[in-house]
């Protein structure tokens, strides 16, 4: 829902409509739900067959693929796909290197395509591995990774992306484009 509101704010001046949407780490389809009505086509990628089965049951996706995100993005067919919007909600917390995945996403975006993602963050610079085995990415690191991938930052907002033991976990909600 946080990703949806961030993308919606970017499109407040014009009607929000996307030809094709790709949901990376789609899980059960929770992040895709608010976007479905604004897309002509929606695909989802996830490592877990159980999650994909739940997503399939929701009827949101035109295509579901069992794959690791970077492997999927690097396939020749996907490089030619040209997605209008790529979503990655609660996915990049499992990656220490954002630059590689952002470069791969930049390759599959259509002209004027956008990427909306969330990351956990921390007050310092760089990347921090937490006790939870989830990575927290500093704001400067996120900005540098976007620039290295050739993506332009459109919006960056601080928000609690989840709670851990009853305590809100600070995150960033990012929208970028090519």
List where the protein language model places each region.
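Conserved alpha-helix/loop element of class I SAM-dependent methyltransferases that forms part
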Residues: 1-18
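A short glycine-rich, Lys/Arg-flanked "PGG" loop and its adjoining helix->strand segment in the class I
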Residues: 99-111
């Amino acid at each position: 829902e946080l990703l949806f509101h961030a993308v919606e704010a970017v499109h407040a001046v014009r009607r929000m409509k996307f030809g094709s949407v790709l949901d990376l780490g789609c899980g059960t389809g929770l992040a895709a739900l608010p976007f479905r009505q604004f897309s002509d086509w929606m695909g989802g990628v996830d490592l877990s067959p159980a999650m994909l089965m739940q997503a399939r049951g929701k009827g949101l996706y035109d295509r579901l693929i069992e794959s690791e995100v970077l492997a999927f993005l690097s396939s020749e067919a996907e490089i030619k796909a040209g997605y209008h919007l790529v979503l990655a909600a609660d996915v990049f917390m499992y990656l220490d290197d954002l630059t590689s995945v952002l470069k791969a996403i930049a390759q599959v975006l259509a002209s004027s395509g956008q990427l909306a993602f969330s990351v956990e963050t921390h007050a310092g610079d760089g990347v921090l591995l937490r006790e939870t085995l989830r990575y927290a990415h500093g704001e400067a690191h996120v900005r540098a990774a976007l620039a290295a991938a050739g993506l332009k930052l459109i919006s960056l907002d601080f928000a609690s992306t989840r709670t851990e033991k009853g305590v809100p976990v600070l995150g960033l909600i990012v929208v970028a484009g090519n």
